[in-house]
């Protein structure tokens, strides 16, 4: 496995651009994008979770520092850096790739949407200089990692919980080979859980539920502002000239001006990434304790609250039901072992779905952030 500048074996799908000479953008990707963004004096453009846009036919491109880029072109920028780093570390030319893909992409309502997302991803690899690309369902790849240590065949249910999707595969694996018995998935996972925390803990302190207006006519603050705040791959959309102008006018029309001012400051000072870091810290702490202290103090924005795990589980109840539905559709009677991977598999309420159906003794996990990559390599 390659190891990157932050010491990890995973490469975050994040890009950061700043204007340089001749108005051309200079790009950083992965861990270096985060470092450059946090250290920059004049903020450029941070772009995250690009895979979440692949199934969307309405979002073909976006403007970055005066130039339009397609989603495929942006992903290709990241892939070129990743390929160059692999070539540097391993000393060989990299022209082929085995790539994990979710069972169901975020926003994909039909098989045609999924096929569209895969084709866009394939185009991105082509733009990045790859000559041959093979795709594998991510939970199937994780199954390959698990099966490498088996001495006898087992029926295995794999649950892969990423940022944007929860994916499941049922397979027969072991020395006798691998047989895929079924796939299912849903376009929600860790990012959705983060969004619930923002909606219930953060957004009320930024004016959600407040009203604005004058001359005796009051209207609620537009909810779409908070919907974009909740989804970290939409944060950059809040920084458009039109939206910033709207946000700047809201405190003067609001019954809670200090909260709307905090919302404007958060967006104008480009604090969204740090906000999501604070939310994710709280989510991780709730996996270890019955309550956690949410604290966000950046610039002029101060938010603090105690969050109870019981409340968090109530906020994500519908999401948990959707995940459980995937498991139940695949069937539970014949499963010998359950293998869980991905950061969201640490959430107690998620693990409880599997413990209630299979018993804790049949559940295993390990290499939660790299098992898919290991499985893809073993299958190559």
Task: State each model region's role.
Residues 164-168, 373:
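Short glycine/serine/threonine-rich phosphate/pyrophosphate-binding segments
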Residues 173-298:
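Phosphate-binding glycine-rich/basic clefts of nucleotide- and phosphate-handling proteins
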Residues 13-16, 167-171:
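Short beta-strand scaffold segments in enzyme catalytic cores
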Residues 1-11, 19, 23, 28-158, ...:
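N-terminal phosphate-binding loop and flanking beta/alpha elements of the actin-like ATPase fold
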Residues 141, 163-164:
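Short, glycine/acidic-enriched loop or turn micro-motifs at the edges of active sites
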Residues 205, 283-290, 323, 327, ...:
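Alpha-helix capping/termination and helix-coil
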């Amino acid at each position: 496995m390659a190891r990157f500048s932050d010491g990890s074996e995973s490469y975050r799908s994040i890009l950061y651009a700043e204007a340089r000479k001749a108005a051309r953008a200079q790009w950083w990707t992965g861990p270096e994008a985060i470092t450059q963004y946090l250290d920059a004096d004049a903020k450029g453009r941070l772009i995250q979770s690009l895979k979440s846009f692949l199934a969307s036919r309405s979002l073909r491109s976006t403007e970055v520092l005066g130039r339009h880029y397609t989603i495929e072109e942006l992903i290709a920028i990241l892939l070129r850096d990743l390929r160059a780093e692999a070539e540097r570390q391993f000393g060989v030319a990299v022209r082929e790739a085995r790539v994990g893909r979710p069972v169901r992409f975020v926003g994909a309502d039909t098989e045609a949407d999924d096929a569209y997302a895969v084709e866009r991803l394939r185009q991105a690899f082509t733009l990045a200089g790859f000559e041959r690309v093979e795709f594998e369902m991510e939970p199937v790849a994780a199954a390959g990692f698990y099966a490498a240590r088996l001495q006898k065949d087992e029926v295995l249910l794999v649950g892969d919980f990423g940022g944007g999707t929860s994916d499941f595969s049922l397979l027969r694996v072991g020395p006798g080979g691998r047989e895929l018995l079924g796939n299912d998935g849903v376009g929600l996972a860790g990012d959705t859980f983060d969004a619930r925390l923002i909606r219930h803990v953060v957004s009320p302190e930024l004016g959600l539920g407040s009203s604005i207006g004058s001359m005796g006519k009051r209207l609620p603050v537009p909810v779409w502002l908070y919907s974009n705040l909740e989804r970290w791959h939409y944060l950059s959309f809040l920084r458009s000239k039109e939206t910033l102008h709207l946000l700047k006018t809201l405190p003067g029309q609001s019954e809670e001006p200090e909260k709307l001012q905090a919302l404007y400051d958060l967006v104008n000072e480009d604090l969204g990434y740090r906000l999501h870091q604070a939310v994710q810290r709280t989510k991780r702490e709730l996996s270890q304790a019955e309550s956690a202290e949410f604290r966000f103090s950046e610039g002029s924005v101060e938010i603090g609250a105690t969050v109870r795990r019981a409340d968090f589980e109530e906020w994500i109840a519908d999401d948990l039901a959707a995940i459980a539905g995937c498991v139940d559709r695949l069937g539970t009677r014949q499963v010998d072992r359950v293998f869980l991977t991905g950061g969201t598999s640490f959430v107690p309420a998620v693990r409880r779905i599997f413990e209630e159906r299979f018993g804790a003794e049949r559940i295993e996990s390990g290499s939660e952030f790299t098992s898919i990559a290991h499985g893809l390599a073993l299958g190559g």
